[in-house]
């Protein structure tokens, strides 16, 4: 695609450089003239030598870097390159616009019809409208009633030999001068370089940048242009039992399916079926396709993804080849259409058939005669009353083509021939558009056309179907005016094309503005097909990522809630065990206190009066506890070990949850179009378990010692009964073999004396 901005910038830079050079030359000339006028009165030798030096400098050209490099290596100007000095002498020209050809590419000379010259675009060359006008004609006489009683008579058909085909039949329905001028342009294309042809065609066609818009090919945009002119998708007679806007349509010889894609796109409003509740695609549109298998087959997979097309029916005829030139395939397709439409027929029939005629453009109309006949025959076989018809044709100069068009003209209420803007202006392509079919399966016409088709399949060449003199003068006048109008437009397009062939630096027309206006006029989006598909893919990826991200968040939140619940349950269990241990210790302490009271009472009865209550000593922290206290400590240690195990299990669960979260985060990081706001680690949302049991620190020991001293002071302040209880407790402890180190020797001596006595 050629952008006008690049050429505008290039021309601006060239113009600015040329203006700067011209200004510099003028300044230099003025300075030299001033110097010479000032020094003209002086006839000194210095001034004379200075002028001679200037002349010598002007005569000796400046050498370029390449010339200096070659001269340095012994190259002499005027001799060829290489060891034998028989190589290239001229410099290699740099082609800025055809850089893909490579250096040294020798382009073919232009044909005699073209000359390399510089051109300027005029106002007529740039005037290209976006709104198109055309003319309808109607048949005054009820021709379809005439053909209902018309017998098939092969005597009306004129035959000619195959070797006597000439272009003389063309001269009857167009100006000879226009045809001769048009033939000159077409014949010059035979010897034109293909690359130069394609470049000039793109630059000279102002509607080239429209291309296929959002559809599979240009045919869909042509259909959009035609539909804007004629409103063909609105049914004239509604189908019984269907909504008012529902249509049956047929698409013949239209692979890969541009017409079909547009019809489904337009009827479904861009892929969005709107209407009453429960409205299905079968209540909006249904299509039947017939095309030849192979390279021209349907390519439904490349249709726009947002367009529903699941009810489209593809047929290939009785022999499963899709060859429409065979009458048995046409009858098979017709029977299936009427079976699926309950005998109602099609409300829209589209035909876009064509063949390759490269190098044989002058014989294009003769080569397409049978194909056009079979498309019109299939239309008569399948279309219902009130249906519309669109068919692609080319030149309409021969009596055979004009006879076919006359049959169509007499069976429709409105008839027209249109060359849409989206059709390339250089070719002779055009479309016949017909509205409101006035008959229903005219069997005489159908049988007559089947008979003609059988003759063509037997290599019979037919010159004329209906005598020209018997046709409607209004129809013949319209054919003549249509041919001349299209010829004039073709000649105008070829004149602009010739300028771009002769001047490769001529900038193209601003195609962006024309494209935007045409798409707005035809009701098509300005974005391309790939832009919409890429946007839809990106949107689906974001939606898919959002769902995965929300699922991951839900899973993480659920796991966090489960972990928190587990931790809370475990913490509650730990507290419950701790309370149970405290209750057990209190219960054991109460029992022990009761025993002590009983012992004190017994000892008080048996004690001597000389005993003193001041014999009590402060408790020793290094003394071992009693047996009951040892059991209590064992229970506490067991409980602490259980709590440690529970805490370890909690930590393991937390580690597993953290690993799961890390895996989820890693999976999210590997995704495309991922949001940076990922779920944080679950560990910061978890409730921390209680700290495990540890050995007492020195500070804790000191605090416990102070607490015990306070308890001792409280005991000293108790009554005598409590002091006796403490004395009895010390005496019971002295019976044990384990004493403090300070009184150990004294206790041994006392026991020894007691044993001796």
Swiss-Prot record:
- EC? 2.1.1.57
**Residue ranges, annotated region (Disordered):** 1-61, 538-670
Q: Where does S-adenosyl-L-methionine bind?
A: 257, 301, 352
Q: Where is the composition biased (Low complexity)?
A: 549-569, 597-668
G-patch domain location: 62-108
Q: Where is the composition biased (Acidic residues)?
A: 18-32, 40-59
Q: What top-level branch of life does the organism fall under?
A: Eukaryota
Q: Which Gene3D superfamilies match?
A: 3.40.50.12760
Catalyzed reactions per annotation: a 5'-end (N(7)-methyl 5'-triphosphoguanosine)-ribonucleoside in mRNA + S-adenosyl-L-methionine = a 5'-end (N(7)-methyl 5'-triphosphoguanosine)-(2'-O-methyl-ribonucleoside) in mRNA + S-adenosyl-L-homocysteine + H(+)
The annotated regions of Basic residues compositional bias extend over 538-548, 570-581
> Which keywords accompany this UniProt record?
Methyltransferase, mRNA capping, mRNA processing, S-adenosyl-L-methionine, Transferase
* Gene Ontology BP annotations: 7-methylguanosine mRNA capping; methylation; mRNA processing
Which residues belong to any copy of the RrmJ-type SAM-dependent 2'-O-MTase domain?
214-438
Which residues participate directly in catalysis? Answer: 392
For this chain, one GO molecular function annotation is: nucleic acid binding
Pfam families cross-referenced by the UniProt entry: FtsJ (PF01728), G-patch (PF01585)
Q: Name one GO cellular component term.
A: nucleus
**What is the protein's known function?**
S-adenosyl-L-methionine-dependent methyltransferase that mediates mRNA cap1 2'-O-ribose methylation to the 5'-cap structure of mRNAs. Methylates the ribose of the first nucleotide of a m(7)GpppG-capped mRNA to produce m(7)GpppNmp (cap1). Cap1 modification is linked to higher levels of translation.
Name under which the protein is recorded: Cap-specific mRNA (nucleoside-2'-O-)-methyltransferase 1
């Amino acid at each position: 695609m050629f952008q006008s901005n690049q050429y505008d910038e290039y021309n601006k830079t060239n113009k600015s450089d040329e203006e700067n050079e011209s200004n510099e030359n003028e300044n230099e000339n003025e300075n030299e003239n001033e110097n010479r006028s000032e020094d003209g009165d002086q006839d000194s030798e210095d001034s004379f030598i200075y002028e001679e030096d200037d002349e010598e400098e002007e005569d000796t050209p400046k050498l370029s870097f390449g010339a200096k490099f070659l001269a340095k290596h012994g190259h002499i100007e005027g001799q060829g390159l290489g060891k034998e000095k028989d190589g290239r002498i001229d410099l290699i020209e740099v082609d800025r616009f055809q850089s893909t050809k490579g250096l040294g590419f020798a382009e073919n000379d232009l044909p005699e019809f073209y000359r390399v010259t510089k051109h300027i675009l005029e106002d007529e060359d740039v005037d290209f409208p976006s709104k198109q006008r055309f003319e309808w004609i109607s048949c005054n006489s009820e021709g379809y009633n005439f053909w209902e009683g018309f017998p098939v008579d092969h005597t009306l058909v004129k035959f000619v030999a195959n070797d006597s085909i000439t272009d003389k039949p063309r001269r009857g329905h167009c100006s000879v001068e226009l045809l001769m001028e048009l033939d000159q342009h077409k014949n010059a294309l035979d010897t034109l370089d293909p690359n130069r042809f394609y470049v000039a065609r793109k630059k000279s066609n102002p509607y080239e940048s429209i291309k296929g818009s959002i559809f599979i090919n240009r045919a869909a945009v042509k259909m959009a242009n035609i539909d804007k002119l004629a409103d063909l998708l609105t049914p004239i007679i509604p189908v019984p039992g269907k909504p008012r806007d529902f249509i049956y349509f047929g698409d013949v010889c239209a692979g890969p399916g541009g017409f079909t894609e547009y019809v489904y796109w337009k009827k479904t409003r861009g892929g969005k079926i709107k209407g009453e509740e429960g409205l299905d695609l079968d209540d909006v549109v249904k299509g039947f396709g017939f095309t030849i298998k192979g390279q021209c087959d349907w390519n439904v997979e490349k249709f726009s993804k947002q367009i529903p097309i699941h009810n489209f029916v593809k047929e290939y005829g009785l022999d499963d080849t899709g060859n429409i030139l065979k009458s048995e395939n046409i009858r098979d397709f017709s029977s299936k259409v009427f079976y699926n439409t309950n005998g109602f027929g099609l409300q829209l029939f589209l035909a876009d058939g064509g063949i390759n005629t490269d190098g044989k453009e002058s014989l294009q109309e003769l080569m397409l005669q049978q194909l056009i006949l079979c498309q019109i025959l299939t239309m008569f076989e399948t279309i219902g009353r009130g249906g519309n018809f669109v068919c692609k044709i080319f030149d309409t100069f021969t009596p055979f083509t004009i006879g076919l068009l006359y049959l169509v003209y007499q069976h429709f209420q409105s008839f027209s021939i249109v060359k849409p803007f989206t059709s390339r202006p250089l070719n002779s392509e055009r479309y016949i558009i017909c509205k409101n079919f006035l008959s229903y399966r005219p069997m005489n016409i159908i049988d007559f056309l089947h008979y003609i088709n059988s003759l063509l399949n037997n290599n019979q060449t037919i010159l004329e179907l209906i005598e020209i003199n018997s046709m409607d003068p209004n129809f013949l006048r319209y054919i003549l005016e249509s041919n001349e109008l299209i010829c004039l437009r073709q000649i105008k397009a070829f004149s602009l094309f010739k300028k771009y062939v002769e001047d490769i630096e001529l900038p193209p027309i601003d195609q962006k503005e024309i494209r935007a206006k045409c798409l707005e006029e035809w009701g098509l989006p300005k974005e391309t097909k790939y832009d919409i598909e890429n946007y839809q893919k990106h949107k689906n990826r974001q939606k898919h990522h959002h769902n995965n991200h929300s699922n991951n968040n839900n899973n993480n939140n659920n796991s966090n809630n489960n972990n928190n619940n587990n931790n809370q349950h475990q913490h509650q269990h730990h507290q419950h065990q701790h309370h149970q241990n405290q209750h057990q210790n209190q219960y054991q302490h109460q029992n022990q206190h009761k025993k002590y009271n009983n012992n004190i009472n017994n000892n008080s009865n048996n004690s001597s009066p000389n005993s003193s209550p001041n014999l009590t000593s402060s408790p020793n922290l290094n003394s071992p506890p009693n047996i009951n206290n040892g059991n209590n400590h064992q229970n506490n240690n067991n409980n602490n070990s259980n709590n440690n195990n529970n805490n370890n299990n909690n930590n393991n669960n937390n580690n597993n949850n953290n690993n799961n979260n890390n895996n989820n985060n890693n999976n999210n990081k590997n995704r495309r179009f991922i949001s940076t706001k990922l779920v944080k680690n679950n560990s910061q949302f978890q409730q921390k378990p209680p700290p495990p049991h540890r050995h007492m620190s020195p500070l804790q020991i000191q605090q416990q010692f102070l607490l015990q001293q306070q308890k001792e002071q409280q005991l000293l302040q108790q009554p005598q009964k409590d002091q006796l209880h403490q004395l009895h407790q010390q005496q019971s402890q002295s019976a044990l073999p384990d004493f403090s180190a300070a009184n150990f020797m004294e206790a041994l001596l006392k026991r020894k004396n007691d044993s001796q006595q």
